[in-house]
Amino acid sequence: MLIVGGGLAGLVASLLLVKEGHAVTLVEKKVYPFHRVCGEYVSNEVLDFLKRNNLYPDFLELPHIDTFEFSDTQGKSVFLPLDLGGFGISRYQLDLWLYQLASEQGVKFLTGTTVTDLVFLEKEDLFQIKLSDFQVLQVPVVLGAFGKRSKLDQVLERPFFTKRSPYIGVKYHVLAEGSPNTVALHNFQGGYCGFNAIEEGKFNLCYLGNRDQLRQYGSIEEMERAVLWKNPLLKRIFEESTFLWEKPEVITEINFERKKPVENHLLMLGDAAGLITPLCGNGMAMAMHSALLVTEALREGKTRQEVEQHYSRRWNSLFYQRLGVGRAIQGLFGSGRGSVIARNLIAHVPFVARTLLKNTHGQPF
């Protein structure tokens, strides 16, 4: 069995599947440890699952997050208690921890390696995979955990790949004066910025911005000063924080178009199956849950068709609506008028805000 991509979905799937007796090889284009653009807030819906499977990194002191702060583009904010809450942890630490566990438990890793071509051979009922190191593999099952956007999406001719997206993602780690129990979402014209505590007293500062604004101002730093700093709360964070990296992690072409959980017999996991808007704060939990779903499908399905149908059905029942709600409410964020409406809803009709949160999150599993 081959897993393409070593993010949360791929790593957790490898750990679950090797425990079930599968021989698992995982291909990852980078070499651990490394940073990823990610909000680094994990919903507590995964807490029981992680502890039950001995995957929770209890050697780290992680901040417990139970409050949501929302500010509009003018910097006026409102707070809302979170029913489930969550915790903050960097992908640098979490991915490294899961990678080390998987290596110890027998997962074979091909790091610094990419898949250059992938075809399903109907007659042989096998996948043929070509790797960047010129290896050619033939395997019966391939899991696609290659993230938001990959060259494999182009190889598979997935429809979203040809649609340009205006969104960019930018992430920093900082030292700052902030509340460790609060995850904040600060709006600015054209996007929004998440801010929450992670391990070792650090904070994650990660925002979804607009490519056109970056072009207009010529650099990330100038765009931040001209656009993000118009929200006084963001201006204060940027001015008063100690930035721990020389330059941020940046990704482009972040696309929230619908995707399918199964493409040409590939079982898609995490962001490769569907990317939830970051404002929902649920991508990391969904990645881990999809790993569990695919493990259950492979256990219970007797044929390829049964596995694919089982996985598609369960994936859609749990995530399809969640992704749709995220896309629908995205318009309330990153605009002056929309963010004021959202702030007023949270402040004066908290029931609506809680309903939206419930519809973008799942139950503990």
Stretches with model-predicted labels:
Residues 2-6, 15-38:
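Glycine-rich FAD pyrophosphate-binding loop
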Residues 4, 144-145, 268:
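Redox-cofactor binding/interface segments in oxidoreductases and associated redox assembly factors
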Residues 10-11:
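N-terminal Rossmann-fold NAD(P) dinucleotide-binding loop
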Residues 22, 55, 107:
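Short phosphate-binding/catalytic loops that engage adenosine nucleotides
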Residues 47-99:
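A conserved beta-strand/loop capping segment in the N-terminal third of enzymes
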Residues 101-234:
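Predominantly flavin-linked oxidoreductase catalytic cores and closely associated redox partners
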Residues 215-294, 305:
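FAD/FMN-dependent oxidoreductases across multiple families
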Residues 296-365:
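C-terminal helical "tail/cap" subdomain of flavin- and related membrane-associated enzymes
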